[in-house]
From Swiss-Prot:
Gene label: ARHGAP12
SUPFAM superfamilies named in the record: GTPase activation domain, GAP, PH domain-like, SH3-domain, WW domain
Biased composition (Basic and acidic residues): 594-609
UniProt biased composition (Acidic residues): 580-590
Residue stretches making up the Rho-GAP domain: 656-844
Region spans: Disordered: 152-241, 293-316, 428-466, 580-629
Highest taxon of source: Eukaryota
Modified residues (Phosphotyrosine): 243
Limits of the SH3 domain: 12-74
SMART domains: PH, RhoGAP, SH3, WW
Name the record gives this protein: Rho GTPase-activating protein 12
InterPro entries: ARHGAP12_SH3, PH-like_dom_sf, PH_domain, Rho-GAP, Rho_GTPase_activation_prot, RhoGAP_dom, SH3-like_dom_sf, SH3_domain
Amino acid sequence: MKMADRSGKIIPGQVYIEVEYDYEYEAKDRKIVIKQGERYILVKKTNDDWWQVKPDENSKAFYVPAQYVKEVTRKALMPPVKQVAGLPNNSTKIMQSLHLQRSTENVNKLPELSSFGKPSSSVQGTGLIRDANQNFGPSYNQGQTVNLSLDLTHNNGKFNNDSHSPKVSSQNRTRSFGHFPGPEFLDVEKTSFSQEQSCDSAGEGSERIHQDSESGDELSSSSTEQIRATTPPNQGRPDSPVYANLQELKISQSALPPLPGSPAIQINGEWETHKDSSGRCYYYNRGTQERTWKPPRWTRDASISKGDFQNPGDQELLSSEENYYSTSYSQSDSQCGSPPRGWSEELDERGHTLYTSDYTNEKWLKHVDDQGRQYYYSADGSRSEWELPKYNASSQQQREIIKSRSLDRRLQEPIVLTKWRHSTIVLDTNDKESPTASKPCFPENESSPSSPKHQDTASSPKDQEKYGLLNVTKIAENGKKVRKNWLSSWAVLQGSSLLFTKTQGSSTSWFGSNQSKPEFTVDLKGATIEMASKDKSSKKNVFELKTRQGTELLIQSDNDTVINDWFKVLSSTINNQAVETDEGIEEEIPDSPGIEKHDKEKEQKDPKKLRSFKVSSIDSSEQKKTKKNLKKFLTRRPTLQAVREKGYIKDQVFGSNLANLCQRENGTVPKFVKLCIEHVEEHGLDIDGIYRVSGNLAVIQKLRFAVNHDEKLDLNDSKWEDIHVITGALKMFFRELPEPLFTFNHFNDFVNAIKQEPRQRVAAVKDLIRQLPKPNQDTMQILFRHLRRVIENGEKNRMTYQSIAIVFGPTLLKPEKETGNIAVHTVYQNQIVELILLELSSIFGR
């Protein structure tokens, strides 16, 4: 069956693979065919050889060879195009007004900024801040405010700084500052994570504004204004410095952060935190390859106090084109670190931010486009929006939602929030938090995160069902028993997953802290939980958690209340989770493509260990009945000898006594030995290093398995095409004989014979061979004649008498008990085999 269409719909948030080479094989119930260029959804990387994929969400998964495919970039549904009202398609001039307000209270404190960003000592203005729409505006002090208008000319999306540089009018300058002696020019430029556009046609270095004089982080995120002082055309450097009403803003030359060259310090979704050579932190997006000095806004818990805004009407807005370029941070309050009202926020298994509606259970994912703008798309890929949908809920629904989230507010200890700047905020859970729905969102570095006003309004941690400190140990993993090792771990219950980290550290959850990656995760779907018996642990307050993957945990706490709460919450979570069928379990993993590419027959596999699901407890009466039936079965079970006598069990070929094997096959030479010798003489006499080169042990074991189970063996099959596999199996047959071809009781006699004079050696060895059992004599004769033919083709295969003797000496001749004379015995073993090969006609006749 053909698997995928090249033009299939790309589902957002999925990981896809692309086929690089054609491949086909026979599965258990169908024929798998993949073609070059086809794409599939990656379900699981099972091992290094095979990956599990499926054509679409509703199809059955199957396996493809990992070497034949490649993983492609994760696709996401592109955001809808936002048209700006009145924006012409052709090149026209669009005037913008950036309204900068200042307070007259500090008119005598404004600093003078030269064109090189060095402060003078004249006057000082109020600092710029951002409102909820990420627009620049001044801090709000009571007093008279004056608008300073900057006219910007836009041409084909680029700012022209020749003839249309934004000018500060003399009238406005005189009214605002009173003593500015000449025209000033300010260029406002857009920057993004991935590129910086130059506004200076004269080639002067760009200089960025710093928002925080203490942190020194640049405004390098998307939709950020970059303000620079330039000289108008045909004029020299201005006689007087350029002034603007900006407070505590730094202008410095800076480049993009370097590419990461070391592992990430911290990972949050697709964003990684790194340090450069000077120890300064910067941020890198794995998906979009964006780099920035400033923490991404959508990942931070930015909060403000009540006093930051006295009047919402004082917020200054950018013009329509300004909003067009800065849509990524001007849409919803969910970008401030807390989800919008009516939505709950969590991370999915791939680290994406997932929003679930509290009213409709609809799921939406957040993504960032190539320009750094945030948008949202539904989990099924049918819709994409710049903002999350808004629902009008009744007061009763809101009360139920608030009640369901009340678990997080019962914490007795203070909550510690970790900021991106690694400073902390301690919240007292007994304090009443004022509503924050109407509060605008600010960058974190607008005010010190450790200031007292943040303690009242900082957002609470991400919604979680339960978390706390527990003692935990594994007693089984993947169905195998492991040694108990009790550890104190910080446990976090997230949906159907129970996560464990080392310690609480500086966060109430494993998100946002330095230990953001959990030590291990437990899937609660299909799990069982019960109080542990005394034979499992001597500790008190211990319960046992078993997963359907075969992992067994013991969880303990000295506090009775804590352990009872955890037991109730986990029991409730397990009961509410539906057990999903794993299609990958039912699908049999095929053999390695490089070895058995054309295999048309499936090898007989060992029975799989089926996963048991504990659906309901068994009554004690049923348990007694089961034990009784098992006892009856064991007592009536026939012995192994009786089964062999009836012919139900047959001895295997490998490891069987040579005489018994020949008797069972009604001959004096094993059929497998004849089969291997005939195949080698037909196909392998001219192979370089025949018998000296080892074959693939895994394939040799498969051949051994086929021989032992009386399967129809065809050595011409493509899966046995490697001649060294055949020779390796033949050597293994003689090596695994219970008694070697030269029997134990004659070993010392053969050693004494080889020590005699050269003329007497041949006769002594010949007499000893005649004393061996008939199957040993005949098998030895056919084997040595075959090895002699191999040596006769030595010009092609480069095998000599000595090299063959080294290979077969220890295999055919060995003492019953190894002693300290192993090296001496090896010399004699090789000499005996070499003598028989040289004197073959004298010993066995022609």
